[in-house]
């Protein structure tokens, strides 16, 4: 059996609950590691049709003494809904899982969100473990305890904050990740670079210029640093009443774009990439961000092979209406995460309709800035 190899461990401590984020290789097939976080005789693995043929058997093999039930869901953001959630509940109930059971999320952000939400609500809360298999889930979605399903009206409208027992990031799972999915995950890394600034921003810029791949030697520690940044923020503000909202940089635009296209045109990270560019242009329009930084953001997204413009087929008025469902809204006021410079972002509730409209027009494909 391949030997377990640890790269880094990030500790997250929220509301008296502490858990590790373990960045490693061969963790998925290490019985000692997995069973450290499984305290009961019952386990439900939630995965999807893409990941199951690749890794489900490996995970089951390290749980031979457990009642190990499995739910295999359809793959894709469009399946992050009440029907899929009910499938998880049905399996838990039909297989007589008790309150001491553990749910394992084996997959990307969609699986983690749904399995986590099921764990937070089944019998008022059971243990769960995140085994993220996409770069986006590893650097962002699996850490911090956000769980949710989508509603036809908008993304992540129904959810909870519920922390896992552990996040085990086995970097070997990235070897089977499609190139497009890998690039989508880079968008969240660029987001962290903009939030943190300094040397981290410069390093992300440099590795993207060189060409960041799954084989890049810098990747494990970059993932660990992203997890550290997120852990530090969510430890201060678990329920997004303050500083955690900064993690939504670019997401007001991204979620509206995803909802507009029924989650069928872009992966989440691709929509975030467009949203980051929109946020940079909006910040420039408000006189906050220098144009050379906007150009740097654009180049980073291009180097990452990500989209950054809104297609001219999108109805901007309808897109603006969808932004009205944004979860950062307070007192009926739409709030945006703005960029003064890399490392200096803040929440702004004073963006005028004219400024927003001009921004949207300027980020449409084929339009001149």
UniProtKB/Swiss-Prot annotation:
The keyword Transport does not apply. This is 3-dehydroquinate synthase. Zn(2+) binds at residues 188, 251, 268. Pathway: Metabolic intermediate biosynthesis; chorismate biosynthesis; chorismate from D-erythrose 4-phosphate and phosphoenolpyruvate: step 2/7. Keywords: Amino-acid biosynthesis, Aromatic amino acid biosynthesis, Cobalt, Cytoplasm, Lyase, Metal-binding, NAD, Nucleotide-binding, Zinc. Gene3D superfamilies: 3.40.50.1970, Dehydroquinate synthase-like - alpha domain. HAMAP family: DHQ_synthase (MF_00110). One of its GO terms (biological process) is aromatic amino acid family biosynthetic process. It catalyses: 7-phospho-2-dehydro-3-deoxy-D-arabino-heptonate = 3-dehydroquinate + phosphate. Its EC number is 4.2.3.4. Belongs to the sugar phosphate cyclases superfamily. Dehydroquinate synthase family. It is found in: Cytoplasm.
């Amino acid at each position: 059996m391949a030997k377990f190899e640890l790269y880094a461990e990030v500790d997250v401590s929220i509301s008296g609950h502490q858990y590790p984020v373990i960045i490693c290789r061969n963790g998925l097939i290490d019985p000692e590691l997995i069973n450290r976080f499984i305290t009961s005789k019952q386990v439900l693995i939630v995965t999807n049709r893409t990941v199951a043929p690749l890794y489900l058997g490996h995970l089951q093999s390290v749980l031979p003494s457990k009642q190990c039930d499995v739910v295999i869901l359809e793959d894709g953001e469009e399946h992050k809904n009440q029907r899929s959630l009910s499938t998880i509940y049905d399996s838990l109930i039909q297989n007589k899982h008790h309150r001491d059971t553990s749910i394992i999320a084996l997959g990307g952000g969609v699986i983690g969100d749904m399995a986590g939400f099921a764990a937070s609500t089944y019998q008022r809360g059971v243990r769960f473990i995140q085994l993220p298999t996409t770069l986006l889930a590893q650097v962002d979605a699996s850490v911090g305890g956000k769980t949710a399903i989508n509603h036809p009206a908008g993304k992540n409208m129904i959810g909870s904050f519920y922390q896992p027992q552990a996040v085990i990031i086995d970097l070997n799972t990235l070897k089977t990740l499609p190139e497009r999915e890998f690039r989508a995950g880079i968008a969240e890394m660029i987001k962290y670079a903009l939030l943190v600034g300094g040397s981290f921003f410069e390093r992300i810029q440099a590795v993207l210029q060189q060409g960041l791949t799954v084989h890049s030697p810098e990747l494990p520690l970059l993932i660990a640093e992203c997890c550290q940044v997120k852990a530090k923020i969510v430890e201060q503000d678990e329920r997004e009443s303050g500083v955690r909202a900064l993690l939504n940089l670019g997401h007001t635009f991204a979620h509206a774009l995803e909802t507009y296209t029924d989650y069928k045109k872009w992966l989440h990270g691709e929509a975030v990439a467009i949203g980051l560019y929109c946020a940079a242009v909006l910040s420039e329009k408000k006189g906050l961000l220098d144009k050379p930084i906007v150009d740097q953001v654009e180049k980073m997204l291009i180097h990452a092979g990500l989209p950054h413009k809104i297609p001219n087929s999108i109805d901007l008025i309808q897109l603006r209406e969808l932004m009205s469902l944004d979860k950062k809204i307070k007192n009926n006021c739409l709030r945006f995460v703005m960029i003064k410079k890399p490392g200096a972002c803040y929440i702004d509730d004073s963006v005028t309709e004219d400024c927003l409209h001009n921004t949207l027009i300027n980020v449409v494909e084929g339009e001149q800035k």
